[in-house]
Amino acid sequence: FLEYLDKDRVRVQLPGLSQELLQKTPGFSGADLANLLNEAAILAGRR
């Protein structure tokens, strides 16, 4: 899980981000989490 939150992928370090994501995404695989973070980046880029 944490490999998707490394410094290269998530530029902003938010306290508790990994714990909050773990609580809100039970049963997600690594691929699911990667897709979630990619979609979030795309949406942020559009704004």
UniProtKB/Swiss-Prot annotation:
GO terms for biological process: cell division; proteolysis. In the N-terminal section; belongs to the AAA ATPase family. In the C-terminal section; belongs to the peptidase M41 family. One of its GO terms (molecular function) is ATP binding. GO terms for cellular component: chloroplast membrane. It is a multi-pass membrane protein. Its EC number is 3.4.24.-. It comes from the Eukaryota. Binds 1 zinc ion per subunit. The keyword Manganese does not apply. Its cofactor is Zn(2+). It is found in: Plastid, Chloroplast membrane. The lineage of its organism: Eukaryota, Viridiplantae, Streptophyta, Embryophyta, Tracheophyta. Keywords: ATP-binding, Cell cycle, Cell division, Chloroplast, Hydrolase, Membrane, Metal-binding, Metalloprotease, Nucleotide-binding, Plastid, Protease, Zinc. Seems to act as an ATP-dependent zinc metallopeptidase. This is ATP-dependent zinc metalloprotease FTSH, chloroplastic. Pfam families: AAA_lid_3.
